[in-house]
Amino acid sequence: MHGEITTLQDYVLDLEPEATDLYCYEQLCDSSEEEEDTIDGPAGQAKPDTSNYNIVTSCCKCEATLRLCVQSTHIDIRKLEDLLMGTFGIVCPGCSQRA
């Protein structure tokens, strides 16, 4: 650009398209490797669907509020709920030191 006022001639308009390499350099893995990836577990069963659950309960000794985050299946979290509603209790770190 020359001067204070820009004109169309100041811009380069004679751009040429560049050649682009369209060759794909991706390497595919063997079909035997793919089969190994699809097998989950020793019996070839798929892993169960798990989720994170936040549990708020109280210490069975001092009644302090305890917060836990666990990863479990829906069925197993129901089993834990049954345990917590029964005689199963969780002890806070302070009470575990005193025991």
UniProtKB/Swiss-Prot annotation:
GO terms for cellular component: host cell cytoplasm; host cell nucleus. SUPFAM superfamilies: E7 C-terminal domain-like. It is found in: Host cytoplasm; Host nucleus. Coiled coil: none annotated. The E7 terminal domain is an intrinsically disordered domain, whose flexibility and conformational transitions confer target adaptability to the oncoprotein. It allows adaptation to a variety of protein targets and exposes the PEST degradation sequence that regulates its turnover in the cell. Gene3D superfamilies: 3.30.160.330. A motif (LXCXE motif) lies at residues 22-26. Belongs to the papillomaviridae E7 protein family. Its main location: host cell. HAMAP family: PPV_E7 (MF_04004). GO terms for molecular function: DNA binding; DNA-binding transcription factor activity; protein domain specific binding; zinc ion binding. One of its GO terms (biological process) is symbiont-mediated suppression of host type I interferon-mediated signaling pathway. A zinc finger (unnamed) spans 59-95. The gene is E7. Plays a role in viral genome replication by driving entry of quiescent cells into the cell cycle. Stimulation of progression from G1 to S phase allows the virus to efficiently use the cellular DNA replicating machinery to achieve viral genome replication. E7 protein has both transforming and trans-activating activities. Induces the disassembly of the E2F1 transcription factor from RB1, with subsequent transcriptional activation of E2F1-regulated S-phase genes. Interferes with host histone deacetylation mediated by HDAC1 and HDAC2, leading to transcription activation. Highly phosphorylated. A motif (Nuclear export signal) lies at residues 77-85. This is Protein E7. Homodimer. Homooligomer. Interacts with host RB1; this interaction induces dissociation of RB1-E2F1 complex thereby disrupting RB1 activity. Interacts with host EP300; this interaction represses EP300 transcriptional activity. Interacts with protein E2; this interaction inhibits E7 oncogenic activity. Interacts with host TMEM173/STING; this interaction impairs the ability of TMEM173/STING to sense cytosolic DNA and promote the production of type I interferon (IFN-alpha and IFN-beta).
